[in-house]
């Protein structure tokens, strides 16, 4: 079953799903802006198009991830994103 989600007054939208090849995941798009997300469990984020400027928990330097690149976020944590152009992503819940 597909589940639609909307965050930050509609600037981030995603569709959640579960599949045998991916497990529990969501795909979505972020508009330009700055966002802080909290995680309940570990996540694997893959940038599909565009780029995400990311500050991960425990880090002091921002890192940019572009299309095809992956980063991991620990569970029960927060991470910060800066988005300069509309960017699509795949988030797998590990």
Swiss-Prot record:
The keyword Cytoplasm does not apply. Catalyzes the phosphorolysis of diverse nucleosides, yielding D-ribose 1-phosphate and the respective free bases. Can use uridine, adenosine, guanosine, cytidine, thymidine, inosine and xanthosine as substrates. Also catalyzes the reverse reactions. One of its GO terms (cellular component) is cytosol. It comes from the Bacteria. The keyword Transferase applies. This is Pyrimidine/purine nucleoside phosphorylase. Gene3D superfamilies: Jelly Rolls.
């Amino acid at each position: 079953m597909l589940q639609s989600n909307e965050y930050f007054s509609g600037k981030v939208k995603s569709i959640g799903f579960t599949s045998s090849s991916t497990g529990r995941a969501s795909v979505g798009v972020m508009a330009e802006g700055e966002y802080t997300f909290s995680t309940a469990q570990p996540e694997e984020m893959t940038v599909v198009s565009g780029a995400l400027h990311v500050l991960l928990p425990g880090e002091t330097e921002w890192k940019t991830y572009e299309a095809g690149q992956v980063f991991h976020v620990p569970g029960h944590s927060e991470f910060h994103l800066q988005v300069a152009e509309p960017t699509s992503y795949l988030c797998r819940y590990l």
